[in-house]
């Protein structure tokens, strides 16, 4: 999973405002809402129902990973609470979503040992602190959003020094719908089409427009991989998840539909380059694609004289 071969408006950010469906009454206590929002924030949504479907996707398709995902999310949330970080941001899931992905990655990539749970807790807590530093510096002058950068940086560090467990790739059905579903499932390191279906339902409940863009991104990514002769990667969804995330990041720019399309194209183009790294690229193509677009948007909005001045600052 997430290997290269199987063997917001102008500044896209994670959601901090409620995005609940119409007439939805949230029955969860605050801590559960924060956790579920952490799962949905992986998809750049704030919606506990969406988060619940993401949780179910993991539970039904890879139950052995659910403990790591919950542990990573809890570590991020409790670290934020212990350190007195902004409560609104905690409830929005901003301190949990990187922990979710870190818990999934470490549970999948590393063999079980007594050190694995403490490692997930430490990595999840560290991701929370990195997000906080990023949020502290956010403002009018902040160009780049954090996205899943803490997850990627911590994940790369652990994979470089750790000893990943052996994994075998099962034969995949050459089915276009299954490939599309896997493209969404791989966002959570899941290669089961059922996982992708549940994630798609969660996205539809949170934001139908965003769901449509995510599906389009996954479809374009898989199609490009097929055309490029990467059939195995295409049917595994490995060219779909970064494109889907890039589309989600710019899906709210309704008056500029070319932005999510450009984000999708950049994410797909960057994926083969990042495949040359000694570790899996994870969500780095998505992050870099969005950062390039954000830098470009900032440069275009800045007056020419001011841009020239900044070259020497």
What are these regions (language model features)?
Residues 2, 14-85, 158, 183-190, ...:
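N-terminal signal-anchor module of multipass membrane proteins
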Residues 59-71, 110-123, 183-192, 231-240:
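Structural signature of hydrophobic alpha-helical transmembrane segments
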Residues 92-166:
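Membrane-interface helix-loop-helix junctions at boundaries between adjacent transmembrane segments
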Residues 117-118, 141-150, 236-241, 277-289:
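Loop-to-transmembrane alpha-helix initiation sites
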Residues 143-195:
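Long hydrophobic alpha-helical segments that form multi-pass transmembrane helix bundles
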Residues 150-154, 213-221, 259-271, 286-289:
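Central hydrophobic cores of alpha-helical transmembrane segments
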């Amino acid at each position: 999973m997430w290997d290269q071969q199987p063997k917001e408006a102008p500044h896209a950010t994670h959601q901090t405002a409620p995005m609940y469906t119409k007439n939805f009454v949230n029955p969860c206590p605050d801590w559960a809402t924060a956790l579920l929002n952490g799962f949905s924030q992986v998809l750049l949504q704030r919606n506990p129902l969406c988060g619940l479907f993401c949780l179910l996707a993991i539970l039904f398709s890879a139950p052995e990973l659910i403990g790591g995902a919950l542990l990573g999310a809890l570590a991020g949330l409790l670290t934020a609470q212990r350190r007195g970080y902004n409560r609104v941001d905690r409830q929005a899931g901003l301190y949990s979503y990187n922990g979710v992905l870190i818990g999934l990655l470490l549970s999948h990539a590393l063999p079980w040992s007594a050190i694995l749970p403490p490692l997930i807790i430490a990595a999840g807590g560290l991701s929370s602190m990195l997000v906080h530093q990023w949020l502290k510096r956010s403002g009018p002058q902040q160009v780049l959003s954090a996205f899943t950068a803490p997850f990627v940086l911590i994940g790369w560090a652990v994979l470089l020094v750790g000893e990943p467990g052996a994994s075998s790739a099962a034969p995949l059905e050459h089915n276009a719908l299954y490939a599309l579903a896997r493209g969404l499932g791989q966002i959570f390191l899941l290669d089961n089409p059922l996982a992708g279906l549940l994630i798609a339902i969660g996205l539809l409940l949170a934001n139908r427009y965003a769901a449509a863009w995510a599906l389009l991104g996954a479809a374009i990514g898989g199609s490009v991989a097929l055309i490029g002769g990467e059939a195995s990667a295409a049917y595994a969804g490995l060219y779909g998840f970064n494109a889907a995330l890039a589309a989600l990041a710019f899906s709210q720019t309704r008056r500029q539909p070319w932005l999510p399309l450009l984000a999708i194209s950049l994410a797909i183009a960057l994926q083969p380059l990042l495949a040359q790294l000694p570790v899996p690229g994870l969500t780095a193509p998505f992050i870099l694609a969005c950062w390039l677009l954000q830098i470009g948007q900032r440069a275009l909005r800045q007056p020419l004289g001011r841009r020239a001045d900044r070259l020497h600052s």
